C-alpha cells in the first residue's frame, strides 16, 4: 500500500505511533519513532487538521494518499519531558511492504545424545495470504513456504514443523495449494453449501516439495484454513498433529450481504447513496475434511496433546452462542500408499505410540513441564475466581502477590532460556531485502529540517536513541511447545535409523 509506513493505535483519543515499519518513508525520514503522538495532519502546504479524538480510520485516510505526495504531521515526541513540545514532520508518501505477517523459518539444533544434534526446520505461518484481484502485487503463502522449505532443505533439515498456532485462517485457495506441497494429488477439503451441493477441492499437482517427516503444531487459535491444512494432512496420514487437545473449530464460511444491494424489493433499496449501508454477515457454506468429518466445533484433534492454559479458556467455536453443530458427509474414496511412494508417514507400525509415549515421559519428568503445569494451575485458579475483594488493603496485597509471582516466572524463564536450543533464522528474500534497506537507512546521518521544531528537542538525542534502538536485540522467547515438538521430531528422525524410537532430551 501507499502511505508513510507506521503502525498506528488509538491511545485514549490520541493517535500514537506503535511501530515504524522497516524500509518505509517514516523510517527513511529518521524523524519519527515509536510512542510519538500525532496531533495534526496537513496535506502538502495546507493548514493542519486537528486529529485529537478523531477515529483512527479517518486519521489513516488523511495520512494515506498518492505516491510521491507530501503529508505533514504535527508530532508530540514520545520521549519529550515537556508535553508542550511539538515538531512538524513532512513525509513523502511511498510504497510500504508489509513483511511482519509473512512466513518465517528457523533451523533448530536438537541435542540427540553423544554430542550429536538433529537439525529440525520450523516454518511459522501467521495466516493464509495471497493475491486478491487484478494488479495485486502480494506474495502468496504457498510461494513463501516453498522458498523456506528449499532453504531449510539446503541447510540440512531432517524434519519440518509447520507452526500454525496463531494462524486464524485466510484464503481457502492457498490452504489447498499449501497442502499440495506435502502430498501428491488428492482431496484436501469438501465444501457444502446451504442447498446441499458439495464441491471437493483437491491438489492436482503430483509433485511434492517435502516428503520427509512433518509435524503440524496447532492451538485453540488455529482456525478455519489452518484447520483445513492440519485436518487434510492428518487424514492423509502425512503429518503428526501436536499442540492443544484440538484446534478452534471454525468450519463455516460467511459472506457479507449489503442489504440495499441484495434485497432490491425491500425498503433498504431506497436508502440514499450517502447513507451508511446496512449489511449482514450470513453463514453460507461448511467445510468437511476428506474423511467426511466437519471441522466445525470439534476442530482437528492432536495426535500428541501438550498441557495448555487454552484448554479451559472460552476461546473455541463451541464457546460462541448459536454455533452450528458438528456434522459429517460421505468420505472421499482416496488413499496414498506412502510405503510405495517412499514418503515418511507417522502411521508406520508402532511409530505413533512410541512418539506419544516418549513425549508423555518428558512431560512428566522435565522441569519445564513442571513449571508449565504450575503456571496453568495459577491461571486456572485466577480464572475460576468469581468474587473480588473491594478492600483496598486486600487489593494492594493482591497486586504485590501478583508482581512477586510474575517476577518469579521471569526468573524461571531466564534460567530455562540459558539452556535453550541453538536456532538459526531463515527469512524470505523480500524480508531480507527489507531488513537490508532498513539497516542502510539507519546508517545514514539524520537530515535536520530547519524550522520544523516547536519547543525544545535535540536532533542529536533522537539520533542517539535511534542508534540504541537499532542495536537492541529482542530477548529470546523460551517456547516450551516448540521445544517439545522439536524433540518429538527428533525421535521420529532417529526412529528412521533405528527399530525403536529413542527418547532424546
Model-derived features: positions:
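A generic structural signal for well-ordered coil/turn residues at beta-strand boundaries
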Residues: 2, 85-87, 119, 276-283, ...
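Cleft-lining beta-strand/loop regions that shape enzyme active-site pockets
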Residues: 3, 7-34, 39-265, 286, ...
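Mixed-charge, polar/low-complexity N-terminal
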Residues: 7, 11-14, 18-20, 151, ...
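Amphipathic, alpha-helical segments enriched in basic
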Residues: 48-50, 204, 208, 270, ...
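A general structural signal for short secondary-structure boundary/capping elements
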Residues: 206-208, 263-268, 327-334
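Polar, glycine-rich mid-to-C-terminal structural blocks
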Residues: 225, 237, 242-244, 248-317
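Conserved functional hotspot residues or short segments at active or partner-binding sites
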Residues: 288-290, 294-501
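Short, solvent-exposed mixed-charge patches
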Residues: 503-505
